[in-house]
């Protein structure tokens, strides 16, 4: 990681909620998190954590769209999901060189803070991979999954990334729920 700060981390927020409940820092009920640009409401859900937030919006930049279209023939969308994401629909995800795709687009998208996701759609499921600015390819990115889901969802949707699955339910025209597991790995102390 390059030390840069993201606007939010949805998987991190879900893990923070699970940590609070696990350690009895607050009752096991709704917790609201305020990020740089979103309110995320978390609540327990069948041994998982459900996060509810506003449906992402399409980012409109016709000049950027034209520049990206010169570098990829695949359908793509620019999405503001709390973090900015360039989502490219592909016929394959596993066999793609995500690093090369990112490097090809980096000069256009990195200065604007766009992460890159490629996804393959199959009915109500998207297989996906994400390259985050300053990090590289990640096992799972919650805001990327949210961005892809927002492009494809009618009522229910699932994303599958190398790190696992997230499920989405569109609640109305304004909100979407994201459900997924959290896993407690270890705890430690830092002396300062």
Model-identified regions with their sequence ranges:
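Active-site proximal loop and beta-alpha junction motif in alpha/beta enzyme cores
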Residues: 1-8, 13-140, 147-192
């Amino acid at each position: 990681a390059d030390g840069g700060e993201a606007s939010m981390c949805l998987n991190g927020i879900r893990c923070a909620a699970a940590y609070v409940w696990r350690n009895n820092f607050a009752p096991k009920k709704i917790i609201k998190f305020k990020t740089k640009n979103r309110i995320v409401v978390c609540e327990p859900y069948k041994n998982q954590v459900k996060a509810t937030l506003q449906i992402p919006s399409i980012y409109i930049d016709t000049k950027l769209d034209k520049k990206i279209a010169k570098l990829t023939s695949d359908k793509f969308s620019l999405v503001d999901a709390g973090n900015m994401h360039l989502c490219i629909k592909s016929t394959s995800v596993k066999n793609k060189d995500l690093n090369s795709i990112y490097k090809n687009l980096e000069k256009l998208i990195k200065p604007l803070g766009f992460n890159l996701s490629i996804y393959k759609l199959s009915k109500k499921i998207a297989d996906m991979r994400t390259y985050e600015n300053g990090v590289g390819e990640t096992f799972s990115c919650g805001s990327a999954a949210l961005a892809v889901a927002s492009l494809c969802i009618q009522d229910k949707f699932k994303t599958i990334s190398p790190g696992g699955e997230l499920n989405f339910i569109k609640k109305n025209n304004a909100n979407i729920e994201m459900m997924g597991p959290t896993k407690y790995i270890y705890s430690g102390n830092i002396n300062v």
